[in-house]
C-alpha cells in the first residue's frame, strides 16, 4: 500500500513537471514569434555584424553634409581623398564593419547639389571597401538659427516667427525659444511660410536621402532624428506618433533598418518623467526591423551612467526593439551658465579622456546587455578640443588638396576594446569579403 502511494505521488509530480515544461516551451516560442525583430527562431537576439556579432563601428562627419546655414564654411580643410582614405583605413581592421554617418537637414537646404553628391560619394566608397553605413539625420542645439555659434540641424525657414524664435536665442533644452519650438514641433504646428507643416517637409527630405543611397549594398539603414528634445511629460506619445509617421512614410521606399533615437535631456529626476515606460512610448507602431538608439558618454559602472544604461535596456524590452549605442565615449562634464543664465552641464575638454581599461569596461557592459550595435564618437577631419573625440589626425597638403589620414591612439584603444571583448584569438575566423583583399 505504501509503495503504491509513493508511486502515485511520483507519477503526479512527473505529470505536473511535464505540463510546466510544455507550457513554458509554448510561451517561449510565442514570445520569440512576437519579437521577430529582436529574436530569431531560436529565441536569440539578432546580431548581424561580423560572425553574427553586433555591428561595431564609428561615427563619421562629412563636409557639405554638415555645413550650417548661419555660419561660414568650416575652417578645417577638407581633403579630396577623405572618404577613399577613411574607408580604406577602416576596412583594414578586423572589427570595424560600419559607420554612422551624420548629416543635417539645414546643410541640404544650404547646398542641395553638393550635399547629394557627397552622399553618393560616401555610398560608392563604402560599397568599394565593404563598410556598412547608417545615415543619421542629426541635430545639435536644434539649429544654427537658434544657436548661431554651435547649433546645426533644422533649416532656418522653420523659424519664421521673429518673436518666438529670435535668431541666436538659444537651442539647448534650457532655452525658452527651443522649448517653445520643440513643443510646437511635436504638436505638428511648425510650418514653412507657405503653410506646409514641418513633418511633411522632413518626410520629403528623408525620402531624398533614401532615394539617393538605398540602392547601395553598403546602406545599412537610417536614423530618423538624433536626440530630439522633450519638454513636457505629454510629449512622449506625440514623439511615438511622429516616429510612426516617418517609419510608415519611409517603409514605402525601403525595407532596411530604421532607427529612432532617445530624447534629451536624460535627467532621471526631471518633471518630464524620464522612465522606461515613457521611453517605450516613443517607439513606432510598426516595429519590423526597427532599432532604438541612445548615447552614453561615460563608464556605466555605477551611479548615473549605470542607471542610464539600465533605463535604456528596460525601455528596449518594453518596446520590443533592440538597442544601438549610436554614440559612446568617456567625458568629464562641469556645470556652467548658459546665455539665459541657466545652469547646464558642458564637456570639460581638458579633463576628458578614455583609457584602454575604460574602453574595455564600457564595451564589456554593452556586450552584457545584448546590443544590436555600437559606434564610437568620432571620425572627423575637424580637430576637436576634446582629445578622445579625435580618432584621426589629418596632414593636409595644400598643393594637392589631399590629406594623409593617421589614426590616433584613440583609434587603437577603440579597436582593441572591440577585439578584446568580442573576438577571442581561437575564435577569430573572419568572413571572406572585399576587406580581406585590400593591400
Where are these regions (language model features)?
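Sec-dependent signal peptide cleavage junction
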Residues: 19-35
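Sec-dependent N-terminal signal peptides of Gram-positive bacterial secreted proteins and lipoproteins
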Residues: 4-24
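Aromatic-rich peripheral "rim/lid" segments of glycoside hydrolase catalytic domains that contact
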Residues: 174-175, 179-186, 335-344, 348-439
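Active-site mouth of glycoside hydrolases
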Residues: 39-273
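Short, loop-centered acidic/histidine patches that primarily coordinate divalent metals
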Residues: 104, 326-329, 377-380
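Extracellular glycoside hydrolase catalytic/binding regions
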Residues: 71, 79, 192-372, 390-394, ...
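Low-complexity, Pro/Thr/Ser/Gly/Ala-rich linker/spacer regions in secreted
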Residues: 33-48, 426-439
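A short acidic, often aromatic-flanked loop/helix-cap motif at beta-alpha or helix-coil junctions
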Residues: 66, 299-301, 382-384
Amino acid at each position: 500500500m505504501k509503495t503504491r502511494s509513493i508511486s502515485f505521488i511520483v507519477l503526479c509530480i512527473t505529470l505536473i513537471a511535464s505540463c510546466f515544461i510544455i507550457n513554458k516551451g509554448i510561451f517561449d516560442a510565442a514570445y520569440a514569434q512576437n519579437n521577430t525583430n529582436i529574436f530569431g527562431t531560436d529565441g536569440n537576439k539578432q546580431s548581424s555584424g561580423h560572425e553574427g556579432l553586433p555591428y561595431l563601428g564609428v561615427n563619421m562627419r562629412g563636409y557639405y553634409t554638415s555645413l550650417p546655414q548661419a555660419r561660414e564654411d568650416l575652417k578645417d580643410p577638407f581633403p579630396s581623398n577623405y572618404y577613399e582614405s577613411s574607408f580604406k583605413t577602416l576596412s583594414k581592421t578586423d572589427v570595424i564593419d560600419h559607420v554612422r554617418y551624420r548629416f543635417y537637414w539645414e546643410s541640404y537646404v544650404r547646398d542641395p547639389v553638393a550635399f547629394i553628391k557627397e552622399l553618393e560619394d560616401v555610398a560608392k566608397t563604402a560599397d568599394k571597401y565593404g563598410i556598412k553605413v547608417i545615415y543619421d539625420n542629426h541635430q545639435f542645439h536644434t539649429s544654427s538659427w537658434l544657436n548661431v555659434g554651435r547649433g546645426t540641424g533644422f533649416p532656418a525657414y522653420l523659424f519664421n516667427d521673429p518673436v518666438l524664435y529670435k535668431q541666436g536665442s538659444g537651442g539647448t533644452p534650457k532655452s525658452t525659444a527651443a522649448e517653445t519650438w520643440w513643443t510646437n514641433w511635436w504638436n505638428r504646428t511648425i510650418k514653412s511660410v507657405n503653410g506646409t507643416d514641418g513633418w511633411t517637409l522632413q518626410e520629403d527630405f528623408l525620402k531624398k536621402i533614401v532615394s539617393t543611397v538605398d540602392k547601395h549594398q553598403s546602406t545599412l539603414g537610417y536614423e530618423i532624428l538624433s536626440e530630439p528634445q522633450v519638454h513636457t511629460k505629454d510629449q512622449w506619445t506625440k514623439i511615438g506618433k511622429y516616429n510612426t509617421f516617418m517609419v510608415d512614410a519611409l517603409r514605402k521606399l525601403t525595407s532596411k533598418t530604421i532607427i529612432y533615437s532617445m530624447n534629451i535631456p536624460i535627467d532621471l529626476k526631471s518633471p518630464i518623467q524620464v522612465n522606461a515606460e515613457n521611453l517605450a512610448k516613443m517607439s513606432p507602431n510598426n516595429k519590423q526591423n526597427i532599432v532604438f538608439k541612445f548615447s552614453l558618454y561615460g563608464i556605466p559602472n555605477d551611479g548615473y551612467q549605470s542607471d542610464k544604461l539600465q533605463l535604456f535596456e528596460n525601455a528596449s524590452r518594453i518596446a520590443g526593439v533592440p538597442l544601438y549605442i549610436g554614440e559612446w565615449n568617456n567625458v568629464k562634464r562641469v556645470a556652467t551658465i548658459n546665455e539665459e543664465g541657466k545652469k547646464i552641464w558642458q564637456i570639460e575638454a581638458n579633463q576628458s579622456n578614455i583609457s584602454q581599461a575604460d574602453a574595455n569596461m564600457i564595451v564589456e557592459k554593452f556586450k552584457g546587455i545584448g546590443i544590436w550595435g555600437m559606434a564610437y564618437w568620432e571620425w572627423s577631419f575637424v580637430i576637436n578640443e576634446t582629445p578622445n573625440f579625435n580618432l584621426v589626425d589629418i596632414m593636409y597638403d595644400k598643393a594637392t588638396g589631399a590629406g594623409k589620414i593617421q589614426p590616433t591612439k584613440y583609434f587603437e584603444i577603440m579597436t582593441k576594446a572591440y577585439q578584446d571583448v568580442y573576438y577571442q584569438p581561437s575564435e577569430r575566423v573572419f568572413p571572406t569579403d572585399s576587406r580581406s583583399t585590400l593591400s
